């Protein structure tokens, strides 16, 4: 059965996420049909969604203007998986600590935007992630931090004592960019019954 995956194609690493979900699906013996989402009407056709990074205020405005935000909320309410990364985490949150960001309120967290500094301060670090046997090569670029975690959410990984990956029901969100590595285990963790394959980060 083909997996229909939608990538919100407003900003961010759209092609990288598309490639990652194809590799993750292939690792589980399942073909993937990847669709780019720019207007309403595509989300209801998708089994899984990816919300990449970019600029959170711009992303939230476009989602609201096009009516994609309501479709994403319905997708999550139906128990369908969503992987949100970096600015996608901010937009997905309950509270972005920024009135300019219209959040989706599908991830019960409060977020501190750009908590890990400017783009020049970006870094990569091996990260222990709950559910993964080996450290994940996490790429942080002006990354947000999860300040507060709701009762139903679970912290999957922390860096320097602060949460940077979380699961809330069908939503997995990361402060870092899993699509910028050859390691697709985070995409597997989000979309394939929480059973990532035994794939090394340099595969």
From Swiss-Prot:
CDD domains referenced in this protein's UniProt entry, alphabetically: GATase1_PB
* Cellular component aspect of the GO annotation: cytosol; glutaminase complex
Tagged with keyword Oxidoreductase? no
State the Gene Ontology terms under molecular function: glutaminase activity; pyridoxal 5'-phosphate synthase (glutamine hydrolysing) activity
Q: Active-site residues?
A: 86, 177, 179
Q: Name one Pfam family in it.
A: SNO
Q: Which UniProt keywords apply?
A: Glutamine amidotransferase, Hydrolase, Lyase, Pyridoxal phosphate
Q: Please state the Enzyme Commission number of this protein.
A: 4.3.3.6, 3.5.1.2
Q: In which pathway does it act?
A: Cofactor biosynthesis; pyridoxal 5'-phosphate biosynthesis
Question: Which one GO biological process term can you cite for this protein?
Answer: pyridoxine metabolic process
Catalyzed reaction equations: aldehydo-D-ribose 5-phosphate + D-glyceraldehyde 3-phosphate + L-glutamine = pyridoxal 5'-phosphate + L-glutamate + phosphate + 3 H2O + H(+); L-glutamine + H2O = L-glutamate + NH4(+)
What sections of the sequence does the record tag as coiled-coil?
none
Q: Which residues of the sequence carry a binding annotation for L-glutamine?
A: 54-56, 113, 141-142
Q: Reply yes or no: does the keyword Hydrolase apply.
A: yes
NCBIfam families tied to this protein: PLP_synth_Pdx2
- HAMAP family found in the cross-reference section: PdxT
- Family, similarity comment: Belongs to the glutaminase PdxT/SNO family.
How it assembles, according to the record, is: In the presence of PdxS, forms a dodecamer of heterodimers. Only shows activity in the heterodimer.
State what this protein does: Catalyzes the hydrolysis of glutamine to glutamate and ammonia as part of the biosynthesis of pyridoxal 5'-phosphate. The resulting ammonia molecule is channeled to the active site of PdxS.
Designated name of the protein? Pyridoxal 5'-phosphate synthase subunit PdxT
Which species expresses this protein natively?
Halobacterium salinarum (strain ATCC 700922 / JCM 11081 / NRC-1) (Halobacterium halobium)
Q: What is the lineage of its organism?
A: Archaea, Methanobacteriati, Methanobacteriota, Stenosarchaea group, Halobacteria
